[in-house]
Amino acid sequence: MTTLVLRAKRWLYLLHRWMGVGLCLLFVLWFASGVVMMYVGYPKLTPAERLAHLPWLDAAQVRLGPAQALRAAGLEQAAEIRLAASRAGQPFYAIVPLAGGRTLRVDAASGQLAGRATPAQARASALAYFGARHAAREGGLVDEDAHTHTRTLDAHRPLYVFEMDDPARTRLYVSSSTGEVVRDAPRLERGWNYVGAWLHWLYPLRGAYWHDIVVWLSVLGVALTVSGTVVGLWRWRFARPYASGSRSPYRERFMRWHHIAGLLFAATTLTWIFSGLMSMNPWQVFGTRATQLDRAAYRGGAAARGLDAGRHHAGLRAGRLAP
């Protein structure tokens, strides 16, 4: 029995040592990139930024009321209707069907249902984003890159890319579906993204096995922390110190520092790694079979009810009226 215990202890020591050698750099990068993310998030176009960069909306160009736009889209009801000069600087209605799905665009002047954006329309949207004050250099079409890893952009792919000549050297991504700017990424934000979210979420490994890779690396991190805590407690003298007078057996400064710091921050490190593991919802542990919320019933009545009564204010929530 004693032999088995000693052998188990030896294997635990070896496990902690070599797992630490193999994973130390990864977890240092994970920690450092997480600190970066606390101050510089993943690039995104916030509602405030979008509203601030919308061109002035000239009410004289709006020939259709919201209800007419709804009929032009072939719908009787909608979950949401917005009017803004978001496509090539021209006024368009954005209509979200009540049943969900792709957002429809209706030209507020002609009543035509808009198709996919052309390169010329995408370029006009990019120029209008800065009020035509800066030149735009075309960067082609991309399906996904380091700054557009998000499910919210799936309906807009592929994306037109434009490098703007503004002081911040902003990169604009324009939806090929709607023709509106859906993401802005200044050069400084792009740079921090590479050492922040891009590195933290292991985006270079994104693919069919990305989720499993992150989950199992986190599991190994939990095992590394638990084994180190157990070994650290075994080696710590609670009753009487070692001959050196220290309660840690290690004479080398680095080893003694590692032993003491490991015990002090074991709980913090374990909860940090474990919370990251749980954020990935491993093996669907947070799955539910509960009945999905009936969103249509939750929203209530039809969005088209009484829309024409407030033609020039009901649909202008996302636009700015010209003086």
What are these model-derived regions, one by one?
Residues 2-323:
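Conserved histidines in hydrophobic membrane contexts and catalytic metal-binding motifs
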